[in-house]
Amino acid sequence: MSTGLRYKSKLATPEDKQDIDKQYVGFATLPNQVHRKSVKKGFDFTLMVAGESGLGKSTLVHSLFLTDLYKDRKLLSAEERINQTVEILKHTVDIEEKGVKLKLTIVDTPGFGDAVNNFECWKPITDYVDQQFEQYFRDESGLNRKNIQDNRVHCCLYFISPFGHGLRPVDVGFMKALHEKVNIVPLIAKADCLVPSEIRKLKDRIREEIDKFGIHVYQFPECDSDEDEDFKQQDRELKESAPFAVIGSNTVVEAKGQRVRGRLYPWGIVEVENQAHCDFVKLRNMLIRTHMHDLKDVTCDVHYENYRAHCIQQMTSKLTQDSRMESPIPILPLPTPDSETEKLIRMKDEELRRMQEMLQKMKQRMQDQ
């Protein structure tokens, strides 16, 4: 039975819009302001790659950022690699994607782990990380802090050989030397050398040894309760996949009628971006699309703050120690004034005395008036 009533939608009148404008403050646009300013300024990210030669570090970096940073690289022979000392090489490139600019710095460590005796071969690398902290601390403590250049290492991809049965002593030594200074993300290199069951066993072994030796690798932050289920699922997959088993390739091959980046073998094709073949996509999503900002935050709020607190503590301790010394400043004997100096001092004293008398007389006259 129809009631015969009609419902009319109420249109917003100019008066209603004015009331809404009065209630609207405007700070809801702050995220947009920050976004515009950040995009205009651009971003910077410093990534260190470490591991023995021949594990595909350069190829993986090229695959991650689609940028060739090693055009002029000279490949060394096995004998040259054995005699090579650890170097620190920086490659910087400006990348732009959809109007967003990224200044990417890759810190390479050729010569690491290639010598017969690798005792403390990570020392030049730890020194480099400390030098960047020190430079930033000096710039931050200076007068001109407007354009501080951030060269701190935000992440270190550490490549683990797939041919061993877990971590080697040099792997443990490197990660323990740097785990309090930089975010370490361990990777199993050249995962196409292993079958899936071998990869799972190697991952379990590496996780056990990381816990056994007390190594602190980068920990993914917990998801907020208001995150959507897709993001939570992606986060769970990232945590379960670590350490990532990766493959890199600069070659485009044809697979099932499509051109993909991968490697061609007699038994088939390994696709770099196929998640059934390796964890490259998970690593790229973590490093670039979801956790790049968190890596920078942890570097600034944890690793750099620890270094800064240590520096301030050392400075305070040194000042306290100096103040407790009996004679921190040597007391030099004062020179004996000669006759001319004594005469000059007497003249100055006489002049001061006359000025005081004049001031006293002027003050007395003002009181009498």
UniProtKB/Swiss-Prot annotation:
<dbReference type="GO" id="GO:0015630">
    <property type="term" value="C:microtubule cytoskeleton"/>
</dbReference>
<dbReference type="GO" id="GO:0005940">
    <property type="term" value="C:septin ring"/>
</dbReference>
<feature type="binding site">
    <location>
        <position position="85"/>
    </location>
    <ligand>
        <name>GTP</name>
    </ligand>
</feature>
<protein>
    <recommendedName>
        <fullName>Septin-5</fullName>
    </recommendedName>
</protein>
<dbReference type="GO" id="GO:0017157">
    <property type="term" value="P:regulation of exocytosis"/>
</dbReference>
<dbReference type="GO" id="GO:0045921">
    <property type="term" value="P:positive regulation of exocytosis"/>
</dbReference>
<dbReference type="GO" id="GO:0019905">
    <property type="term" value="F:syntaxin binding"/>
</dbReference>
<feature type="binding site">
    <location>
        <begin position="51"/>
        <end position="58"/>
    </location>
    <ligand>
        <name>GTP</name>
    </ligand>
</feature>
<keyword id="KW-0342">GTP-binding</keyword>
<keyword id="KW-0597">Phosphoprotein</keyword>
<dbReference type="GO" id="GO:0001725">
    <property type="term" value="C:stress fiber"/>
</dbReference>
<keyword id="KW-0488">Methylation</keyword>
<dbReference type="GO" id="GO:0008021">
    <property type="term" value="C:synaptic vesicle"/>
</dbReference>
<dbReference type="GO" id="GO:0008104">
    <property type="term" value="P:protein localization"/>
</dbReference>
<dbReference type="GO" id="GO:0003924">
    <property type="term" value="F:GTPase activity"/>
</dbReference>
<feature type="binding site">
    <location>
        <position position="111"/>
    </location>
    <ligand>
        <name>GTP</name>
    </ligand>
</feature>
<dbReference type="GO" id="GO:0042802">
    <property type="term" value="F:identical protein binding"/>
</dbReference>
<dbReference type="GO" id="GO:0061640">
    <property type="term" value="P:cytoskeleton-dependent cytokinesis"/>
</dbReference>
<dbReference type="GO" id="GO:0045202">
    <property type="term" value="C:synapse"/>
</dbReference>
<feature type="modified residue" description="Phosphoserine">
    <location>
        <position position="327"/>
    </location>
</feature>
<keyword id="KW-0206">Cytoskeleton</keyword>
<feature type="domain" description="Septin-type G">
    <location>
        <begin position="41"/>
        <end position="314"/>
    </location>
</feature>
<dbReference type="GO" id="GO:0035091">
    <property type="term" value="F:phosphatidylinositol binding"/>
</dbReference>
<comment type="subunit">
    <text>Septins polymerize into heterooligomeric protein complexes that form filaments, and can associate with cellular membranes, actin filaments and microtubules. GTPase activity is required for filament formation. Interacts with SEPTIN2 and SEPTIN5. In platelets, associated with a complex containing STX4. Interacts with PRKN; this interaction leads to SEPTIN5 ubiquitination and degradation. Interacts with DYRK1A. Interacts with STX1A; in the cerebellar cortex.</text>
</comment>
<dbReference type="GO" id="GO:0099148">
    <property type="term" value="P:regulation of synaptic vesicle docking"/>
</dbReference>
<dbReference type="InterPro" id="IPR030379">
    <property type="entry name" value="G_SEPTIN_dom"/>
</dbReference>
<dbReference type="GO" id="GO:0032153">
    <property type="term" value="C:cell division site"/>
</dbReference>
<feature type="region of interest" description="G3 motif">
    <location>
        <begin position="108"/>
        <end position="111"/>
    </location>
</feature>
<feature type="modified residue" description="Phosphothreonine">
    <location>
        <position position="336"/>
    </location>
</feature>
<feature type="coiled-coil region">
    <location>
        <begin position="338"/>
        <end position="369"/>
    </location>
</feature>
<comment type="function">
    <text>Filament-forming cytoskeletal GTPase. May play a role in cytokinesis (Potential). May play a role in platelet secretion.</text>
</comment>
<dbReference type="GO" id="GO:0035176">
    <property type="term" value="P:social behavior"/>
</dbReference>
<dbReference type="GO" id="GO:0042803">
    <property type="term" value="F:protein homodimerization activity"/>
</dbReference>
<keyword id="KW-0175">Coiled coil</keyword>
<feature type="binding site">
    <location>
        <position position="248"/>
    </location>
    <ligand>
        <name>GTP</name>
    </ligand>
</feature>
<comment type="similarity">
    <text>Belongs to the TRAFAC class TrmE-Era-EngA-EngB-Septin-like GTPase superfamily. Septin GTPase family.</text>
</comment>
<dbReference type="InterPro" id="IPR016491">
    <property type="entry name" value="Septin"/>
</dbReference>
<feature type="binding site">
    <location>
        <begin position="190"/>
        <end position="198"/>
    </location>
    <ligand>
        <name>GTP</name>
    </ligand>
</feature>
<dbReference type="GO" id="GO:0005525">
    <property type="term" value="F:GTP binding"/>
</dbReference>
<dbReference type="GO" id="GO:0060090">
    <property type="term" value="F:molecular adaptor activity"/>
</dbReference>
<feature type="modified residue" description="Phosphothreonine">
    <location>
        <position position="13"/>
    </location>
</feature>
<dbReference type="GO" id="GO:0005886">
    <property type="term" value="C:plasma membrane"/>
</dbReference>
